[in-house]
């Protein structure tokens, strides 16, 4: 009788439209209940039975119920699931398999089965890639997933690498393919094989893509020739190898090994500027005045070179600092090192006054055993030989940026616009509270940005610098020339690493067109998006493998009194994040470890400070002593506490 009653349908519709609803993201807790976070200010409680319908990170619409003045959310509609493709550990065997996602807030096993076409017989502890197939908010009874790829077995020593690469859907191996002969590019190559070119790299480097040669001119100015490996002499645009390189976009450098962008025959041999081997190169010749200024007369040309020495950073640095026993093979090589050192000092001085110089941070190198175990983590400070190469590369990239801009009007540029204009007033207000007065308009110009950076570098600590970092925009890859505020340069286009960066290969092809006086098409915008996305994924992969290895390395220090110096890098409501100075590991110090009485403790992300009873006790950039309280291997997180 009521089945088709229009009044009843109307009433139902009315009730539905009057019921309050909210859209937000589900945040799970370890206690079974959760919250629907609508925005930074508002969240609703989700009771444990309702949490069974959703997963941490799901974006949903929920009905809001109010009982006894307490609001709670009942999930109703799925907008975007948190999990689609994921990696995890398999549980159970035979017909009753489930998978636990490898995520700190996802603890529940999801029933699953091997997808059609997957041959592997899954066992307890196997690592796998899975894809979600069912979700309770889509009308399914429960969650369900398909296992789409076997990664590796539980006890594989190299789990951190294989799982991380699978998680980010990145290649595990070097590409196949071989280039049999050089292309006929119609380029005149200058024979520079008689000159004393040298390469300076880490001792273990095989893919040498830059060689340097310096000479002093009669008027006292220095002439620098930068010769760069020439993979585009072997790889035709649009070829299979080229398309593979385009997809990979970069060589992926992970702790312990790299996955090259090009086949190893090219990256480590045919293109690599090995000592005493004749190699094709793309070269740039520039003249540098005593004050470090680069003359406008910049020459790009194709060449043939033969590196006369494979030098290592530490050996060259020791020799220049009069330490150690290493000596250059002959006076010709010694003279090169001395001239390159002079160029480095004058260019560094020029950049200090006219551009910006990054503060030196050490690189951290994992020393690994044959089974992937971490034997040691070594902090490698950036020494004078590193700076020689860095100054030469920055000079060469600045030259390419100018030539491509003036001759073509496009290229692959690294662009950084400093501060987001929307943040300029807030930035000026923050600086004012610390006694620095800047004009909100001026700070958006390259000159104003450089001026501010120099003032910040002159501060006694990096605290204020860390406070304004959140106002900065990110560096981007663009086909349009534009300034790089971070380097303090009017334009910056890299071409010095074509073995490991696809964007540099593109710039090689553009520079060759300039050399030949030919027209060439502007690179497509989608290639810059691919490069930016790959750079992001590679960085995440490097961080993920690093987290795993740090957890392994520090596991036996948990609960001991071993002290580590640690720099505070971030403060949040829940505590502080610190970086261990000696090895670079990131650890978290929960608020209760800072002070037992919660009401007397204020952790302010906004101010970057921790106050106890109104007194600032800790602030970002402080270095404190900590001990390792706990290492959670399943989430690769390190929990520290201030040393007593």
Swiss-Prot record:
It comes from the Bacteria. Its main location: cytoplasm. InterPro entries: CSD, NA-bd_OB-fold, RNase_B_OB_dom, RNase_II, RNase_II/R, RNase_II/R_CS, RNase_II/RNase_R, RNR_Ribonuclease. Residues 561-643 form the S1 motif domain. Its EC number is 3.1.13.1. It catalyses: Exonucleolytic cleavage in the 3'- to 5'-direction to yield nucleoside 5'-phosphates. Pfam families: OB_RNB, RNB, S1. Residues 189-516 form the RNB domain. GO terms for molecular function: exoribonuclease II activity; RNA binding. Involved in mRNA degradation. Hydrolyzes single-stranded polyribonucleotides processively in the 3' to 5' direction. NCBIfam families: 3_prime_RNase, PRK05054.1, RNase_B. Belongs to the RNR ribonuclease family. RNase II subfamily. This is Exoribonuclease 2.
């Amino acid at each position: 009788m009521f089945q088709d009653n229009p009044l009843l349908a109307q009433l139902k519709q009315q009730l539905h439209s009057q019921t309050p609803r909210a859209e937000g993201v589900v945040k799970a807790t370890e206690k079974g209940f959760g919250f629907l976070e609508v925005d930074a200010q508002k969240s609703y409680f989700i009771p444990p039975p309702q949490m069974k319908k959703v997963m941490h990170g799901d974006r949903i619409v929920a009905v809001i119920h109010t009982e006894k003045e307490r609001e709670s959310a009942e999930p109703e509609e799925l907008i975007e699931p948190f999990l689609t493709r994921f990696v995890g550990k398999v549980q159970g065997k035979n017909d009753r398999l489930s998978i636990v996602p490898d995520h700190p807030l996802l603890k529940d096993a999801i029933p699953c089965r091997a997808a059609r076409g997957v041959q592997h017989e899954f066992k307890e502890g196997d690592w796998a890639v899975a894809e979600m197939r069912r979700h309770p908010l889509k009308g399914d009874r429960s969650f369900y997933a398909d296992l789409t790829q076997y990664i590796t077995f539980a006890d594989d020593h190299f789990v951190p690498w294989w799982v991380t690469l699978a998680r980010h859907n990145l290649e595990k191996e070097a590409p196949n393919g071989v280039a049999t002969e050089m292309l006929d590019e119609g380029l005149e190559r200058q024979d520079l094989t008689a000159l004393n070119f040298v390469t300076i790299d880490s001792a273990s480097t095989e893919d040498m893509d830059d060689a340097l040669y310096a000479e002093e001119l009669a008027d006292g100015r220095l002439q620098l020739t930068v010769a760069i490996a020439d993979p585009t002499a072997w790889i035709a645009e649009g070829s299979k190898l080229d398309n593979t390189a385009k997809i990979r976009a970069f060589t992926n450098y992970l702790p312990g090994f790299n996955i090259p962008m090009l086949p190893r025959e090219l990256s480590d041999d045919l293109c690599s500027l090995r000592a005493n081997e004749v190699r094709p190169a793309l070269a740039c010749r520039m003249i540098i005045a005593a004050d470090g200024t680069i003359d406008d007369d910049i020459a790009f040309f194709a060449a043939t070179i033969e590196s006369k020495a494979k030098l290592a950073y530490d050996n060259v640095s020791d020799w220049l600092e009069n330490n150690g026993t290493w000596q250059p093979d002959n006076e010709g090589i010694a003279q090169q090192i001395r001239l390159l050192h002079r160029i480095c000092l004058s260019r560094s001085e020029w950049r200090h006054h006219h551009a910006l110089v990054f503060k030196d941070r050490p690189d951290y190198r994992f020393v690994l055993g044959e089974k992937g175990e971490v034997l040691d983590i070594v902090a490698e400070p950036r020494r004078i030989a590193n700076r020689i190469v860095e100054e030469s590369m920055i000079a060469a990239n600045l030259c390419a940026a100018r030539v491509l801009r003036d001759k073509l009007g496009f290229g692959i540029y690294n662009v950084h616009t400093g501060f987001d204009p929307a943040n300029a007033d807030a930035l000026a207000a923050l600086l004012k509270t610390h006694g620095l007065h800047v004009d909100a308009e001026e700070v958006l110009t390259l000159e104003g940005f450089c001026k501010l950076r120099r003032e910040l570098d002159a501060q006694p600590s990096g605290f204020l610098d860390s406070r304004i970092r959140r106002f900065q925009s990110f560096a981007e890859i663009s086909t349009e020339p534009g300034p790089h505020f971070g380097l303090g340069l009017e334009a910056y286009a890299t071409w010095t690493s074509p073995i490991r960066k696809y964007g540099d290969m593109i710039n090689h092809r553009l520079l060759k067109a300039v050399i030949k006086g030919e027209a060439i098409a502007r690179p497509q915008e989608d290639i810059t998006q691919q490069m930016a996305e790959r750079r992001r994924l590679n960085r995440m992969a490097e961080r993920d493998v690093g987290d795993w290895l740090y957890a392994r390395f520090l596991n036996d220090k948990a609960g001991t009194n071993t002290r580590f110096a640690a720099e505070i890098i971030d403060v949040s409501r829940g505590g502080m994040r610190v970086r261990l100075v000696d090895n670079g590991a990131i650890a978290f110090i929960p608020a209760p470890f800072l002070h037992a009485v919660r009401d007397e403790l204020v952790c302010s992300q906004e101010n970057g400070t921790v106050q106890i009873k109104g007194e600032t006790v800790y602030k970002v950039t402080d270095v404190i002593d900590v001990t390792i309280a706990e290492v959670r291997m399943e989430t690769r997180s390190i929990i520290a506490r201030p040393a007593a």
